[in-house]
Amino acid sequence: MESQRSFLLIGLAMVSFLLWQQWQVDYGPQPAQPVESQQTTGSDAPNSNGDVPIATPTNKSALPTQSVVGKVISVTTDTLQLSINTVGGDVISANLLKYPLEQGSQGTYSLLRPSGPTIFVAQSGLVGTNGIDKGSRPTYSVSQDSFVMEGDSLTVPLTYTAKSGLLVTKEFIFSKNSHEVKVNYHVENTSSDVKSVKQFGQLKQSTADQGGSMFMPTYRGGAFSTEDERYEKYSFDDMQDKNLNQVTPAGWTAMIEHYFVSAWVPPQDQTNSLYSKMTQNGNAIIGFIGQSVDIEPGQSVDIQSSLYLGPKDQDTLEKIARGLDLTVDYGFLWWISKYLFAFLQFIHSLIGNWGFSIILITIVVKGAMYPLTKAQYESMAKMRALKPKMDALKERYGDDKQKMQQAMMEMYKKDKVNPMGGCFPLLLQMPIFLALYWVLLESVELRHANFIFWITDLSVKDPYFVLPILTGLSMYLLQKLQPMTMTDPMQQKIMQFMPVAMSLFFFIFPAGLVLYWLISNIITLIQAKIIYASMEKRGLKTK
């Protein structure tokens, strides 16, 4: 029985640590909001040619000698508000219009930011032998300073005429109710020579600390996908140690943060080069370079890619590219979590409230686990019934551990008791519970999700700490219901203090998680009462 108690204590400690780790992801301070700017200059601006993935020409006189000032155009759709610099045609800011910065606030979540210590921009262009971004960034022409979507789609064209004879129209194509932006290059060759270009797309983000926890840093970094690896994180430290260099059919690259993702998806029917690098001023870059495209004299081609700027919506991401939905990081239990999330989504589609959906899925999961819970309690009861015999064996054999162990095994065999019978059911249940925790922590659907009364956001802590206090009380009642047979005073004190310690943790956990734990404890209390009543009828001791 003592070993089972120790196992439960270790398991609870592991869950607490994992919850604390994931809480850091939830509560990392939001990045500073950008100041509106109509032009971008300086070495930190996204028009710096040093960011372009292909090496600059050996003729140093061809390099830009000063920063180029670009005009910033505004694009507004039903989901996005973007700023695009005409130098390079880079997306230098992106606000997600359907995602408030804070619940009830007028400000929207800023995913891309143009400058300063939190710079995060999406760059793209044409490199290769005749690429217009090869020696310096092109300055595009545009017909107007702002574009607003009025129908189901919007196309924003930027044009550039190169001295080499290439006429380039860079189009940003938006669709209603979508966070995916199609980036299309229409390239016409007016010269008498064959021209060769390669498309690139990359994300540049500052690696500077943005106020994460002193205990556990928030994961904010790169990720990529290849034919062999559907999803692989590539952190800023990884980029610092070694540049990413992968050649793969299809693939994609991304920068990830909690609830949101920015990703470049190149053509999926060609081979692409994925890369990363660190700039001298501490910015991380991850991106792709497409295949070389030859353009015959008098001919034109279209070269397209996709830029996703939005929430980690699994259904949407799965349709855009293979493995992109895995940026919703459920950890090593993702293969369980994805089915639990699908079930949670189904319940929500029926009742329309995420809080009640959490309650219902907890009831279903605990109900499905009831046979295991019953086996666990009955095994523990059988072990308690053997305690007098175990005490007698300890008194008989004293310090002779070998004989003591042999005698105990014979006793277990004779009484048909599995000493680990109380642990195995718990081992089977723990992955289910942990997987559901990841779902509640990682799913953007719970961000700013209302429940009832004072709980208006399930992704943040209970403002009045009602749920944590009730959860601590439920843990105390569970502890009283389950007799403590351990004799070690230190273990007894630790177990007695556990409800208080967990309540303190729950004070800072998201309300959705605490709600899940509270309902789980209440159901466990009810199940324990039923199981104990059944055991008493069969003559098994429950205390």
UniProtKB/Swiss-Prot annotation:
It comes from the Bacteria. GO terms for biological process: protein insertion into membrane; protein transport. It is a multi-pass membrane protein. CDD domains: 5TM_YidC_Alb3, EcYidC-like_peri. Keywords: Cell inner membrane, Cell membrane, Chaperone, Membrane, Protein transport, Transmembrane, Transmembrane helix, Transport. It is found in: Cell inner membrane. The chain crosses the membrane at residues 7-27, 341-361, 421-441, 451-471, 499-519. InterPro entries: Membr_insert_YidC, Membr_insert_YidC_N, YidC/ALB3/OXA1/COX18, YidC/Oxa/ALB_C, YidC_ALB_C, YidC_periplasmic_sf. GO terms for cellular component: plasma membrane. Residues 30-61 are annotated as: Disordered. One of its GO terms (molecular function) is membrane insertase activity. Residues 35-61 have a biased composition (Polar residues). Interacts with the Sec translocase complex via SecD. Specifically interacts with transmembrane segments of nascent integral membrane proteins during membrane integration. Belongs to the OXA1/ALB3/YidC family. Type 1 subfamily. Required for the insertion and/or proper folding and/or complex formation of integral membrane proteins into the membrane. Involved in integration of membrane proteins that insert both dependently and independently of the Sec translocase complex, as well as at least some lipoproteins. Aids folding of multispanning membrane proteins. NCBIfam families: PRK01318.1-1, PRK01318.1-3, yidC_nterm, yidC_oxa1_cterm. This is Membrane protein insertase YidC. It comes from Pseudoalteromonas atlantica (strain T6c / ATCC BAA-1087).
